[in-house]
Regions:
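Aromatic-rich carbohydrate-recognition surfaces in CAZymes
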Residues: 261-355, 370-374, 473-487, 491-499, ...
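Aromatic (Trp/Tyr) and acidic
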Residues: 6-51, 56, 189, 287, ...
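An acidic-aromatic substrate-binding cleft motif
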Residues: 215-261
Length: 549
């Protein structure tokens, strides 16, 4: 740590169940604050490809472990684990760079240190895979590879003693014991241990991936943090938002950690405007152009960049983001815009745009003609119709708006969908929140206040219709949409809810915001989600007129 660095410090008694994340350009380390690699999602990753299960140090016969863990310090650029051993205090300093993981171990005196590394080169969705590993041994390093990839691991000034073996273990038992929910899908994993590193001295440097200097990496990361902190006015927000972004063969934002470690177009496009307002204008526009390059041949936008899986809402959201980019003076991918518009035209059935009912943001529910999807299409046809002076697009927009009023509006409230299980949801607010149609808002505001709002967020589905089912809970995206609607009617109430929402920062992952919460306050799902945090600077600006530390 350098003098002047902002930091979070956690003593052992306050660290139970907490995790942290160090990320750089798609490479990330996810781990428990007490040093445990207690989940199948813990370890060193390159986006959705895992490389390391864990690394472990034995100092003069004593392993660094949660039992002798003492204190944790996090700056966003580095993490420090302080352990109390028989030999004295040992500090483990961890840094992640572009393609590299570096750990410096500072010892109280000259000690013998053994280093064990569990390798598990696998895809994100895999468990035990049985791939064959090969190793190339060197004096102070070893290269481990299988058909998916390879990684070099080393200890500077150490000696590598090859003894390859593979074992089955269940790291997720630790996460389950610490209250992590079933959506982490913990199961048995395999680890390949290539051998042991032996080292003697007072300071050990362990590295995995590319060889690099920790000092250079830290200077670069601190510069980035300072630059973004000026925009967000909060170093924690700056650190968290930076963790999602990568710029490799294409640019993008990972949807969430630890297991939404892919570029989900919907999540990003919902947060396109908030990211710009958070000071990520360059990054957001680069990611938008990457989505354009991965557009499917029929003109639609897939749910995940690089996949063929369809998505109900990403295509109109893409059109709205491109329009915003164009109006701000940025170059918009017009060929892709026209393809996406044509896709919408071809799927217009006379009143609405057809979509797969299984591919809305509530993807565990079937929601045919979802109100938010139709609203996004109506707005997309409207803005591009005006820009292109295209009467057909304007006609389609008006037809969808007419259907929203005639088919969805019942007793002053918009239905969630025409073919779905639930009637009133946060999606019902979208036609008004995004100024798609105009109607009296008194009844929908009253219903939203009674059925969707709680003291720290906004439910996705009416509490009158369902309890704490998965998609009914308080989500980051539902809170964003709900607060935008509420701020028009009762900004003071919106401020109160938002202030309470902010208290969930770091509830599981240091500086991160969880994917979803129950009304009881119990957090669930991914522990650091893009659309749970990216809108915070925008709401601070809208509700207070400025940033807030």
């Amino acid at each position: 740590m350098e003098k002047g660095d902002s930091a979070i410090e956690l003593e052992k008694k306050f660290s139970r169940g907490k995790t942290y994340l160090l990320s750089e350009n798609g490479f990330f380390l996810f781990r428990f604050v007490d040093g445990a690699f207690g989940s199948k999602w813990c370890g060193f990753w390159d986006r959705d490809l895992k490389f390391l299960e864990y690394f472990a140090f034995r100092v003069d016969g004593e392993w660094l472990c949660p039992e002798n863990f003492k204190r944790f310090i996090y700056t966003g650029a580095e993490a420090l684990h302080i352990h109390s051993l028989f030999v004295g205090e040992v500090t483990e300093r961890v840094v992640v760079g572009d393609g590299t993981l570096i750990v410096n171990l500072k010892l109280p005196r000259r000690c013998e240190v053994l280093v064990e590394v569990g390798v598990n080169i696998r895809r994100r969705e895999e468990g035990i895979h049985g791939r064959v590993y090969n190793i190339i041994s060197r004096s102070e390093s070893v290269e481990v590879m299988n058909e998916l990839g390879k990684i070099e691991i080393g200890v500077r000034g150490g000696e590598f003693l090859p003894n390859p073996r593979r074992e089955i273990h269940f790291p997720g038992r630790y996460a389950m014991e610490h209250g992590y929910d079933f959506r982490w899908y913990e199961d048995e994993q395999e680890k390949f241990i290539p051998g042991i590193f032996r080292f003697e001295g007072r300071e050990l440097k362990f590295w995995a991936g590319k060889k690099a200097g920790a000092g250079h990496i830290l200077r670069k990361k601190r510069r980035k943090l300072k630059e973004k902190e000026k925009k967000t006015e909060n170093w924690k927000l700056a650190s968290t938002l930076l963790s999602f972004y990568f710029e490799r063969e294409y640019a993008g934002f990972l949807a969430g950690f630890p297991y939404f470690n892919q570029f989900w177009t919907r999540d990003f496009l919902c947060m396109f405007t908030p990211l710009i307002r958070a000071g990520f204008e360059r990054e957001a526009h680069k990611a938008l152009l990457a989505i354009a390059r991965h557009q499917l041949s029929d003109g639609s936008i897939p749910v995940i960049v690089g996949s063929e899986k369809p998505c109900a809402d990403s295509t109109p959201l893409f059109l709205l983001a491109c329009y915003k980019a164009f109006k701000s003076g940025r170059k918009a991918p017009m060929k892709n815009v026209k393809m996406a518009l044509q896709y919408g035209v071809e799927h217009f059935d006379g009143e609405l745009v057809e979509h797969d009912p299984r591919t809305t943001w509530m993807d565990t529910l079937r929601r045919g003609y979802a109100v938010e999807v139709e609203s996004f299409w109506a707005k997309a046809f409207e803005v591009w119709g005006k820009l292109f002076k295209n009467k057909k697009l304007l006609f389609l927009s008006e037809k969808i708006k007419e259907s929203l009023i005639s088919s969805y509006l019942q007793s002053g409230v918009f239905l969630d969908s025409l073919k779905g299980k639930y009637k009133f949801s946060v999606n019902s607010l979208i036609p008004l929140t995004y100024s798609v149609v105009r109607t009296d808002e008194e009844n929908i505001f009253k219903r939203a206040k009674e059925e969707l709002f709680c003291n720290f967020g906004v439910r996705a589905i009416s509490r009158r219709e369902v309890g704490d089912d998965y998609h009914a809970r308080i989500w980051g995206i539902s809170t964003y949409w709900g607060l935008k609607f509420l701020s028009r009617h009762n900004p003071e109430e919106a401020r109160k809810i938002f202030v309470n929402y902010l208290k969930f920062m770091g509830s599981r992952t240091v500086c991160g915001f969880p994917e979803t919460m129950k009304e009881s306050g119990e957090v669930e799902g991914a522990s650091s989600q893009l659309w749970s945090v990216a809108f915070i600077p925008e709401m601070l600006q809208e509700l207070w007129g400025r940033g807030r530390s």
